[in-house]
Structure formats: structure tokens, C-alpha cells
């Protein structure tokens, strides 16, 4: 019985120690994540966003060339609107007095 216990001790030691060691694949994956995260952060941090608001009388408000709609607002307490062709806000209620669009574009 003592001999069996002595034989099992090295096996148990290997099982325990193998869990604490980092495998080569894990180390490589961690390094790839670090480098990729750094590159992505640098790329994103250099991008700017330019936004402006446009307001028009009636039920349509169109963004300037190169800008896209990011949000719409309507007068007369109307909450129903849609975006047309990615550049124009359309308020769907009858008799709209004004329509607003928030327009943005990416700046490198």
C-alpha cells in the first residue's frame, strides 16, 4: 500500500503543476490580443466625428452632403419619424411645423 502511494505522488504532482503552468499556445494568444488591442485602439483614437444639427420648416430635414442622419426630432409633439436615403429625416404626422436632423460624418 505504501509503495502504491509513493508511485501516485509524482503523478499527482504532475497533474497539479500542469494546471499552474501557462501553455505556449495561451501565451501566444495573450500576446496577439495585447498587440491587436493596441493597434485597434490607436486606429480608433485617431478617428474624429463631426456633427451638426439641421432644422427645416415642414416635414423633411436633409443633412448636408457627406453627412448621415443619426437622429431626428419633430415639432407638434410628433414622435413618428423615419430616415430616408440615410440623409433625410421625415416626420410622419400631418401638419408638421418643423423637422430636425442630427447629422454626423467621420473625420480621419
Curated annotation (Swiss-Prot):
One GO MF term, please? Answer: hormone activity
Expressed, tissue-wise, as follows: Expressed in white adipose tissue (at protein level). Widely expressed, with particularly strong expression in lung, bone marrow, breast and peripheral blood. Expressed strongly in bone marrow and at lower levels in lung, but not detected in other tissues. Isoform 2 is detected in adipose tissue, bone marrow, brain, lung, peripheral blood, placenta and thymus.
Provide the disulphide bond pattern: 51-104, 63-103, 72-89, 74-91, 78-93
Q: Where is the signal peptide?
A: 1-18
Main localisation, per the record?
Answer: secreted
Similarity comment: family membership: Belongs to the resistin/FIZZ family.
Function per UniProt: Hormone that seems to suppress insulin ability to stimulate glucose uptake into adipose cells. Potentially links obesity to diabetes. Promotes chemotaxis in myeloid cells.
**Protein name in UniProt:** Resistin
Species assigned in the record: Homo sapiens
Q: In the UniProt record, what gene is named as encoding this protein?
A: RETN
Amino acid at each position: 500500500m505504501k509503495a502504491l502511494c509513493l508511485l501516485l505522488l509524482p503523478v499527482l504532482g504532475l497533474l497539479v503543476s500542469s494546471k499552474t503552468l501557462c501553455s505556449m499556445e495561451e501565451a501566444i494568444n495573450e500576446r496577439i490580443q495585447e498587440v491587436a488591442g493596441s493597434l485597434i485602439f490607436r486606429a480608433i483614437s485617431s478617428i474624429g466625428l463631426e456633427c451638426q444639427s439641421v432644422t427645416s420648416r415642414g416635414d423633411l430635414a436633409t443633412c448636408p452632403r457627406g453627412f448621415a442622419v443619426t437622429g431626428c426630432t419633430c415639432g407638434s409633439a410628433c414622435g413618428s419619424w423615419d430616415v430616408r436615403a440615410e440623409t433625410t429625416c421625415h416626420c410622419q404626422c400631418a401638419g408638421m411645423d418643423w423637422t430636425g436632423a442630427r447629422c454626423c460624418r467621420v473625420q480621419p
